[in-house]
Amino acid sequence: MKIYTQRLEDISPDQAFETVELTFDTRQKSRFRAALASGVDIGADLPRTGILRSGSYIATQEGDVLRVDAKPERLMKVTAQTEFDLLKAAYHLGNRHVPLMLTPTALYFEPDHVLAEMVEGLGLTVTETDHPFEPESGAYAQHSHDHRLSPIKVLHHVHS
């Protein structure tokens, strides 16, 4: 079994690669097993540096390259009569820290009947659909720099 251990920022245009479709849940993990479309089993033991986004490349130590694509999965799709109503739904779902995928005409989240009822209560339409899930990463994703000289901490006399 090939074990993929490296994340690649980019590959050369002539680089050969295979592809694998993974759910959002799997793409959040640094260690997983999966099967290629050909049925070949692969494994991953990647650095813990964030989510594998659709279109990401990973490689084995031997140089085999694999493109990771978002696999269609069961999601709740929120649509509205107006853009403002869709914005309100995004606000309410965001307040619940739900992984949320935004498009100009719809919101998508993982199945949750309580959230679906809440959104329907706001007057929006919720349907189930199969769609690749690529939620927003959030304001603090990949956020790892030092705040020791942050003006906000200095202003409020916060000590680390």
UniProtKB/Swiss-Prot annotation:
Lineage: Bacteria, Pseudomonadati, Pseudomonadota, Gammaproteobacteria, Moraxellales
One CC-aspect GO term: cytoplasm
Keyword Cytoplasm set for record: yes
Keywords: Chaperone, Cytoplasm, Nickel
UniProt GO MF annotations: nickel cation binding; unfolded protein binding
Record's subcellular location: Cytoplasm
Gene designation per UniProt: ureE
Organism of this sequence: Acinetobacter baumannii (strain ACICU)
UniProt protein name: Urease accessory protein UreE
Record-linked NCBIfam families: PRK13261.1-1
InterPro entries: UreE, UreE_C_dom, UreE_N, UreE_N_sf
UniProt superkingdom: Bacteria
